[in-house]
Amino acid sequence: MSAQVAYLGTSVPDWVRELSSSDPLQRRLGAYALGEIGPAATEAVSDLAAALQDSEAFVRVWAAAALARVAPPGGESVTVLIAELGDELAFVRSLAAWHLGRLGPAFPGIEQALLRLRQLAGDKDPSVRVEAALALGMLEGKGAPPPELKSLST
C-alpha cells in the first residue's frame, strides 16, 4: 500500500531513503515529508526512530516530530523533543517547543514537557520564549495567551 501513499509525488519508501542521505538537509526533508504523510507512513517508524540519533540536532527534531505524527504520540519522540529543548542552538530549542505544542493537551510525558517549557519562559532568546509560551498555551488547553508572553516585553 505504501507505494500508493505519496507526498509531493514521492512514495514513503523513497522518503525513507532520504533519511540515510549524506546531506542533512535531505534527511530533514525526508523526516518532514514522512510526518506530513502521517499514520499512512507507519512502515517508516523504525527508520524515523533511528533518525532520532542523527548527528544533526535539526534532523533529530524533525524526526521526532514526524514520529509523533506517524506513530501514536509518546515514547521516544517526546523524549527527544524534550531533550532538544536544552540544545545550545536557539532555533533547535524553538523548533522543539513548536512541535511539542502541536502534540495537543494529552500525551505520555506531558508533565515533563510542561516543566521544561516553563523553564524556557526565561530563555535568553526571544524566539524560544515565544514558542515556549505558545506551546504552553496549547498544551494547557487555554485559549488566551499564556502569562509567559509578558516576559517578552522585558
Enumerate the language-model features and the residues they cover.
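Structural detector for internal amphipathic alpha-helices that build alpha-solenoid repeat scaffolds
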Residues: 1-8, 25-40, 50, 58-73, ...
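Amphipathic alpha-helical scaffolding segments comprising HEAT/armadillo-like alpha-solenoid repeats
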Residues: 6-18, 39-53, 72-86, 107-121, ...
